């Protein structure tokens, strides 16, 4: 980050791996103090995620304040707490940070779909972490734990996702407009309803 962009309350992440802060490389931090001059260059930060997950009962992951030279920080371009409002079936796309951090195979499976969100209680820290699991929208079998700085919800992604999968014959409807492929999607589920909505919008299924 640049000095002029620093502000208390901004969310940041390390812009590269540093051995001194190796345990913070994948974590989102909040700036809680800024230097008065460029020469001081040290920013006070507190960690808001644990394993990339936010907490529902305590804003910070621990009591520690970490002081980092601001040149090693990068602003997080999404609200890390947006995931608290996500639902099963929501479509996620990588953020700019996600594009830089995710592996090529992981990026090739984008966009992703929210599979489930569970509360995991860490009794050592008295912290309830929201652990959101996501899976590739292309039918990949594996799911992975969401890092809140790596993905964002995209309401417009469904249209492109539907079109690409339909023309690859990964999505099929019968003559009555009922979804028959993929068979794993349950009728009436959020994903089923979203697919049907996009099919009608694209004229594949008639109203």
Where are the language model's segments positioned?
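Short, Lys/Arg-enriched, disordered terminal segments
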Residues: 1-3, 207
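Small side chains
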Residues: 44-45, 92-94, 117, 195, ...
